[in-house]
Amino acid sequence: MNYEQKNIIEEKYLSKLFYTKDNKNRHVGVEIEYSNLDLKKSAQLAQEIFKGEIVEKTKYEISLKDTDYGDFKFELDAQLLQKMQDDNLFEKLGNIIGKISNDLDNFVDKTSKNFVPFEIAMPPIPISDFGKVDKLVQKLRLNGALGTTYSFQYAFGVHLNIEPPSQDIDDVLRLFKSFLILQKWIEVQSEVDIARKISPFINNFSKEYISLVIDIEYWPTKEQFIKDYIDYNPTRNRVLDMLPIIAFWDEDIINKYLPKEKINKRPTFHYRLPNSKVDQFRWFISQELQLWVIVELLASNDEVFNQMSKSFLKQLDNAIFNKNEWIEKCHQCIINHLL
């Protein structure tokens, strides 16, 4: 079953994400992973679009500062590189791989070309200006950047930090529920690569937790939602990571129960599903954001939302979850009732 995204979702629907309930610009932060294009060149390409000043701390830590939107960061996967440094792995590996021990740059270059991605972390950008992000993707592609599908080893992804229309728990939870309902359909549309599915970054929520959340009677207080989420998901490793927004709501509870997790508090969903298809000619990140539009369309339609919630819960109660049947039901619902 393959529903091509070419597209049941028209670009005009992206405008539904432009504003908050208070009629302010909604923003999305983007993190994109790739290889085969050095960070300084990447920063120069971004500067052509976003202006600003390039500041090179090291070859693997570069910033584009003072753009209209804030600062961009260009770096080797920071957590993995820090872990290697903390464990003194560069020196240990140097004893194994000989000459490379005398040339850290060569070693890191070799590592990043095979396993560790370069990453661009963008500041929050108004969704109405998202075309500039697509322009950067095009420049990266034309200059040789490689993405997820180039190699089985490349479990590279795109992370979208999507600002909800409000911080009200019911609004946020309604979108969270809608995502869980549509996730399998979105995975088909987004063509999530198997290398990413087996990587330790985008694990699914448990059936027990999904059943709890999808129940039409589940409309907890913000405090109860936080407690339930942390009880079931004491990890960043979720396809839709809610810990950043929970930290934004209550940083103390994160520090208390998850002191070892590195969490930057943000007033956003941290959506980690999409592949980084930066080397594919017809792909742009806005296509992934358009899929999120469907989540919001479902959340905003009370009748369809309630029907799909009940149907999904019924499917989950079955001994065997028929994924293809559910994907087809989602597709028909979207075509007939949401678009």
Which positions does each model-derived feature cover?
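Short His-Asn-centered micro-motif
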Residues: 123, 161-163
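Active-site palm subdomain of RNA-directed nucleic acid polymerases
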Residues: 142-151
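Short, conserved phosphate-binding/catalytic loop or strand-edge motifs used
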Residues: 152-159
